[in-house]
């Protein structure tokens, strides 16, 4: 299978227009990606720190910023037919882009190990399974979760069409039961916060929940049939989908002191629903996660063998889960998550400023081994994010983009207006 075969999802080239998808398909895949268990814990922190009305305002503002960021990258993905790692060749250089490949790839394989282990451990705990059986489940899940990613976009799409509506029904059921338990909306509005967070920290928490995922959502928005599809699907996935996960976590923390919807469903007496939610929630994110790894790996190795890289990544992630390294990886993965957003800032500045909104065809572009303004801007953005007291990921994006525009302008490195691509 060649890298231009539709079944291989064009890992090293633009997605042609005949392979593009509509809004329902793209939005459903992104919702499957953003329906992520870990996001609920951020909501749990908000639920005990604000009144219900203030909490809703934080969730709306934080997720709107996240959705707009994803939509900006999604628009570029539609226009170019490229994903973030391929865009990285333009802003970081042919060799320099391997830095972003490593960062994005390592983050995803680590989260794959975490998700695989989490599914096995939770089921093992619920059914009181011995350690050997839990390890066996890790192997089973590690291979099972990658099956839809192995198929490609079509596999992710099919699972999302099944998982997303099912999860929505379970979430609505859980929220209805929780609302009744707390005394209706009047009860929610009367809840007194037991903790405290300032708005800056709260927005940082919400925006940072999935900003690394938003940076890599171009893997699917590049399949968009139009700019409208790319932008709306991004907003649906990250403003609505991620926002719902944060809200569910907050609901659980307010009513049950437990942000994880799986645990909440168990407390509500819906044991089978809880197990279904666990598997659907993790699987619909895991397959996207390993797909992200495969895309980054293909660009790193300059290979079109996406399916082979997918399987290799699943094996590595499963081994990390079996070795218990997923527990040790989480702090480093969160750390890496803070250095991913500046990549998006450089990409947007490079596309809109340097390339004036139109990349040349990747196969025809003469790119340097290292694009030092891009690499330097990324470094500035990362340092700014680490030292910022306010919405660190957003500061990292803005600092990286602004630095790139200034340096590129000073060096006179803007391109002439590029001709439109025929995708």
Give the residues covered by each predicted segment:
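Membrane-interface loop-to-helix entry segments
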Residues: 136-141, 145-178, 193, 231-238, ...
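C-terminal membrane-solvent junction of multi-pass transporters and transport-like membrane proteins
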Residues: 20, 344-423
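Membrane-water interface regions at transmembrane-helix termini and the short interhelical loops
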Residues: 45, 49, 74-75, 118-128, ...
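Transmembrane alpha-helical segments of multi-pass small-molecule transport proteins
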Residues: 29-33, 101-105, 116, 127-151, ...
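Extracellular loop-to-transmembrane helix junctions
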Residues: 45-75, 96-98, 238-239
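Hydrophobic alpha-helical segments and their helix-loop junctions in multi-pass secondary transporters
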Residues: 149, 165-192, 202, 207-210, ...
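Membrane-interface "cap" regions at the ends of multi-pass membrane proteins
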Residues: 1-53, 197-203, 222-232, 410-423
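Hydrophobic transmembrane alpha-helices that form the core helical bundles
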Residues: 97-131, 283-299
């Amino acid at each position: 299978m060649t890298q231009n075969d539709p079944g291989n999802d064009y890992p090293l080239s633009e997605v042609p227009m005949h392979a593009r998808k509509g809004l329902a398909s793209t939005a459903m895949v992104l919702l499957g990606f953003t329906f992520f268990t870990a996001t609920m814990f951020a909501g749990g922190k908000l639920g005990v720190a604000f009144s219900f009305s203030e909490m809703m305002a934080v969730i709306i503002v934080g997720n709107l910023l996240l959705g707009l960021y994803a939509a900006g990258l999604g628009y570029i993905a539609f226009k170019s037919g490229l994903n973030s790692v391929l865009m990285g060749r333009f802003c970081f250089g042919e060799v320099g882009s391997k830095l972003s490949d490593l960062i994005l790839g390592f983050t995803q394989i680590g989260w794959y190990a975490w998700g695989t282990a989490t599914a096995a451990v939770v089921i093992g705990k619920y059914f009181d399974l011995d350690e050997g059986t839990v390890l066996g489940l890790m192997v089973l899940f590690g291979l099972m979760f990658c099956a839809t990613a192995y198929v490609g976009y079509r596999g992710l799409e099919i699972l999302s069409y099944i998982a997303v509506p099912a999860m929505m029904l379970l979430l609505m059921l859980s929220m209805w039961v929780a609302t009744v338990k707390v005394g209706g909306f009047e009860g929610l509005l009367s809840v007194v916060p037991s903790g405290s967070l300032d708005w800056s920290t709260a927005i940082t928490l919400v925006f940072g929940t999935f900003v690394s995922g938003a940076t890599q959502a171009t893997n699917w928005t590049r399949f968009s049939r139009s700019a409208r599809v790319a932008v709306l699907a991004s907003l649906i996935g990250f403003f609505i989908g991620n926002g719902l996960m944060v809200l569910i976590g907050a609901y659980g923390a307010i009513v049950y002191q437990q942000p994880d919807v799986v645990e909440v469903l168990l407390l509500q007496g819906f044991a089978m629903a809880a197990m279904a939610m666990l598997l659907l929630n993790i699987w619909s994110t895991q397959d996207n996660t390993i797909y992200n790894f495969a895309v980054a790996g293909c660009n790193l190795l300059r290979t079109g063998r996406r399916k082979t890289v997918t399987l290799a990544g699943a094996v590595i992630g499963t081994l990390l889960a079996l070795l218990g390294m997923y527990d040790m990886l989480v702090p480093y993965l969160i750390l890496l998550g803070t250095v991913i957003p500046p990549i998006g800032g450089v990409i947007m500045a490079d596309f809109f400023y340097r390339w004036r909104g139109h990349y040349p065809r990747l196969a025809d572009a003469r790119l340097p081994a290292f694009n030092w303004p891009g690499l330097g801007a990324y470094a500035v953005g990362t340092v700014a994010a680490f030292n910022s007291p306010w919405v660190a990921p957003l500061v990292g994006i803005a600092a990286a983009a602004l630095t790139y525009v200034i340096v590129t302008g000073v060096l006179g490195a803007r391109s002439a207006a590029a001709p439109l691509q025929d995708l």
